[in-house]
Amino acid sequence: MSLVGGFPHHPVVHHDGYPFAAAAAAAASRCHEENPYFHGWLISHPEMSPPDYSMAPSYSPEYANGAAGLDHSHYGGVPGSGAGGLMQRPVKRRGTANRKERRRTISINSAFAELRECIPNVPADTKLSKIKTLRLATSYIAYLMDLLAKDDQNGETEAFKAEIKKTDVKEEKRKKELNELLKSTVCSNDKKTKGRTGWPQHVWALELKQ
């Protein structure tokens, strides 16, 4: 039966008088021998069709190489365990920078330790910070310069008193007053004094009041 109108399907009559009909029949027979499935599909019922090959995934080298890794990561496995997932993250090497920083820190700490040993009369149980060490060293240098200015050979390091108290906002004002007192003391004491010499007692009294 034909699909159009339900009329019976008339068979095709081949006429030997037409040369192209014989050529077409020969080509159809060769096609049937080479690909019988395709020929059978052409003459079979319209509802029967070959599988749709357009829906099948095309071959891709990237998909083939990374398929194993993708499957593992999709089902909770370890990502990157397939053939294409063997890449490792580059590790930054900072060993050289760390060694340089460590050597620099050790050098600075050793220099401050040597400077603390040069400051006299510092209690043994006192821990001096770096800024406090620099301030005490500056004060001690000023004291030694004052001794040289007075040309006093009897000055001793025991006369220097290391100040351990915390500095306040009025530190600049206190330094100015201390310098004025030192200048007045130098002017009044023209003659050399015998015995131990050092900072005047009233200067230390002023220091203790701060």
UniProtKB/Swiss-Prot annotation:
Residues 81-101 are annotated as: Disordered. InterPro entries: bHLH_dom, E-box_TF_Regulators, HLH_DNA-bd_sf. Residues 92-144 form the bHLH domain. GO terms for cellular component: nucleus. Efficient DNA binding requires dimerization with another bHLH protein. Residues 90-101 have a biased composition (Basic residues). It comes from Xenopus laevis. Pfam families: HLH (PF00010). GO terms for biological process: heart development; regulation of transcription by RNA polymerase II. Essential for cardiac morphogenesis and for the development of branchial arches. Binds DNA on E-box consensus sequence 5'-CANNTG-3'. Heart, liver and spleen. The keyword Transcription regulation applies. This is Heart- and neural crest derivatives-expressed protein 2. Keywords: Developmental protein, DNA-binding, Nucleus, Transcription, Transcription regulation. The keyword Transcription applies. GO terms for molecular function: DNA-binding transcription factor activity, RNA polymerase II-specific; protein dimerization activity; RNA polymerase II transcription regulatory region sequence-specific DNA binding. Signal peptide: none annotated. It is found in: Nucleus.
